[in-house]
Regions:
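Ligand-binding "clamshell"
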Residues: 31-43, 56-58, 130, 135, ...
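A bilobed periplasmic-binding-protein/Venus flytrap-type ligand-binding module shared by bacterial periplasmic
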Residues: 50-61, 166-180
Length: 239
């Protein structure tokens, strides 16, 4: 969708002309709410579009050598996702807290002295014959003739920071979260039938989001809170 079209669709949900929309991630939704004064909320996480590491002159990550070059997108969000993926695969280490705003200046450890070549996202795939590896999002990988499912050497998983942040969601107007129609829509888009369709149709460029990733994160937070509460209770008992 164009930015103008997506704005229209969000306003139609706000006005009640539409019940829901499904084409955006939460940071985009939150930004729109803040800017436009709307009241849209997320009711279901459906899919994400993973970044992947693809072969250039090297065909496997085990072939990485000292001084190799890896091409990544140069815009803020996409570069951060690329760097996080490289970190997840042991190629670099980023400074603590760099997260989804990371840049090459946040690289804390680079044991192979890898050179990061920053390019416009649409240019990255074109330099594959000249660099060891390229890091691409799904649509540019498909445009370059890669099969995301077959050719990516590594890709973002549902439990990655990027996937949990940039998962595409169903959005509704606040107050309509418990509507039976909305619940049915969410259940349908989370069904095994839809997951199978996504997997078959998009060849890995779009991946169904697994709610277990969020559940695991919630469990960790709950465990922390429980531990803190137990500690306070123990201290009070001791007093």
């Amino acid at each position: 969708y164009s930015s103008a079209a997506s704005d229209v669709y969000k306003r139609q949900v706000e006005s009640g002309e539409m019940d829901a929309n499904y084409f955006q991630h939460v940071p985009y939704l939150d930004s729109f709410n803040e800017e436009k004064g709307t009241h849209l909320v997320e009711v279901g996480k459906i899919h994400y579009e993973p970044f992947g590491i693809y072969p250039g002159t090297k065909k496997d990550l085990s072939e990485l050598a000292d001084g190799d070059t890896i091409a990544v997108p140069n815009d803020t969000t996409n570069e951060a996702r690329a760097l996080l993926l490289l970190q997840d695969n042991g190629i670099i280490t980023l400074k603590d807290g760099a997260g989804l705003e990371a840049t090459v200046n946040d690289i804390a450890e680079n044991p192979h002295n890898v050179k990061i070549e920053e390019l416009a996202a649409e240019q990255v795939a074109r330099v594959a014959p000249e660099v060891a590896f390229v890091v691409l999002n799904g649509n540019y990988a498909l445009q370059a003739g890669y099969s995301v499912a077959q050719d990516s050497l590594a890709y973002e998983t549902s439990d990655s920071e990027a996937a949990k942040t940039y998962v595409n969601v169903i959005a509704v107007k606040e107050g309509n979260e418990e509507s039976e129609a909305i619940k049915a829509l969410v259940d349908t888009l989370k069904s095994d039938e839809i997951k199978d369709f996504i997997n078959e149709k998009y060849d890995g460029a779009v991946i169904p989001f697994e709610d277990s990733a969020d559940a695991d994160a919630d469990k960790e937070e709950t465990a922390d809170v429980t531990t803190d509460t137990e500690t306070e209770t123990t201290e009070e008992a001791a007093e």
